[in-house]
Regions:
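Feature activates predominantly on carbohydrate-active enzymes
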Residues: 1-146, 155
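Substrate-binding groove of N-acetylhexosamine-processing glycoside hydrolases
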Residues: 32, 81-89, 93, 99-100, ...
Length: 405
């Protein structure tokens, strides 16, 4: 769980908390709820990149690797190490029995720019950015293990892809198998299909998962006893300063689909995945919706598979259903706009005006449902972000491009 500014930081770190941050009691309740269904919460703390939530504050702005960017912390500033240590300490206080921690380290784009880093590069590191990165990661990992007792430290792989060939032998999984006892794959069930995407396309996310299965079989020699598991991520933003993307209720069927697929793969079982998924989500057989609902002006709705889970019974299904209705409506509106470019505009304009009223009704319903799952500031942000529900990008709908020549 990446808390970011939702963690109940205190004392010298209290400025990191947002107004609606969890308190200690809520954090403990989250842990207890997870434990009750056989899950452990592995805290994820950013220790290199994605540090905007801290570096945006004046108190810590001097720790930026580049003063013009607040995403990357300077690894050569001892106050940076103090900040990271204090964050891990407070995380450990509320996760006192957790064996693992994730120290992030993805997307640290500005490295080796601060004067302190430049000094190290020109003296002890022989100009090697790779060594600068590795020394910081290993220092933080040792801190988490030796000072705070975490047995396992996880780190994202992408920062290691930039390392020179002299650090590890050639061959990705071959070299990793010589260094790491445990390797995880990490896909996404939501939050990776567009910076402001609101509609979860299950098949697109499944393609990544299938590619991992293929990758495993191609490299089974090196991964057989080291692939420890698969992390199914569900991001809510691309970064601290970007808009909200797909909401969690909208991603539940995608999560279920991937979890079932991973379970079958890891346990080497072949089952009827779609049927199992519908049983898992407590779905009823859809009789009430005619197939004509998904056909408009000769076009067929491309996301019928996602829509059918609106009849299921899982936490958040009410919001999921309205989001899917919104997806269907904006698809029909996109078709009307497409047709208006190649036919007479009067007829299609009348259709669009009728749809405008449907968009307004949907927005009102969604606004009411959002309050059941999110804090008020998140609801306000989503509504401000989508002031008009008929303003989504149509590129993901698969419509042909009109010839306007």
């Amino acid at each position: 769980m990446e808390y970011e500014d939702m963690f109940p930081y205190s004392f010298g770190l209290s400025v990191l908390r947002r107004k609606t941050a969890f308190d200690e009691m809520t954090t403990k309740q989250l842990k207890e709820s997870a434990n009750a269904i056989g899950l452990n919460i592995i805290p994820l703390i950013q220790t290199f990149g994605h540090f905007e939530f801290a570096l945006k504050h004046q108190e810590f702005s001097s720790l930026r690797e580049d003063p013009n960017w607040m995403d990357t912390i300077c690894p050569s500033n001892e106050r940076s190490i103090w900040l990271i240590r204090e964050m891990i300490s407070q995380i450990r206080h509320l996760h006192h029995d957790e064996k693992s921690i994730h120290i992030g380290c993805d997307e640290a784009y500005h490295i080796g720019l601060d004067k302190a880093c430049q000094l190290r590069l020109n003296t002890t590191l022989n100009g090697s950015i790779d060594r600068l990165k590795l020394e910081h990661i290993s220092r933080v990992a040792r801190m988490a293990k030796e000072e705070f007792g975490f047995e396992q430290v996880l780190v994202w792989y992408d920062i290691l892809t930039w390392l020179g060939q002299g650090i590890f032998p050639d061959g990705l999984f071959e070299r990793f198998s010589q260094v790491f006892d445990n390797i995880y794959f990490a896909g996404a069930f939501k939050g990776a299909d567009g910076i402001s995407q609101q509609f979860v396309h299950i098949e697109r996310y499944m393609q990544t998962l299938r590619s991992y299965q293929k990758l495993y079989h191609q490299n089974e020699k090196y991964l057989k006893d080291r692939l420890t598991g698969i992390i199914l991520t569900g991001w809510q933003r691309y970064s601290h300063t970007t808009p909200l993307c797909e909401l969690l209720p909208a991603g539940i069927p995608s999560l279920a689909r991937q979890a079932i697929s991973v379970s079958q793969w890891m346990n080497k079982k072949e089952e009827r995945t779609d049927q199992f998924m519908q049983e898992f989500l407590n779905c009823s057989v859809r009789h009430s919706t005619s197939a004509t609902k998904f056909v408009h002006k000769g076009f067929t709705f491309p996301f019928v598979f996602e829509f059918k889970f609106s009849d299921c019974q899982f936490p958040g299904v009410e919001l999921y259903s309205e989001i899917e209705e919104l997806n269907l409506l904006r698809w029909k509106a996109a078709i009307e706009r497409y047709i208006s470019n190649i036919e007479t505009e009067n007829e299609t304009q009348n259709e669009l005006e009728k749809m405008e009223e449907e968009f307004r009704k949907l927005r009102k319903t969604i606004a009411s449902l959002l309050g059941h799952f999110f804090y008020e500031d998140t609801v306000d942000e989503w509504l401000a972000q989508h002031g008009h529900l008929n303003r989504f990008n149509d590129d993901d709908l698969g419509l042909p491009r009109p010839n306007r020549l």
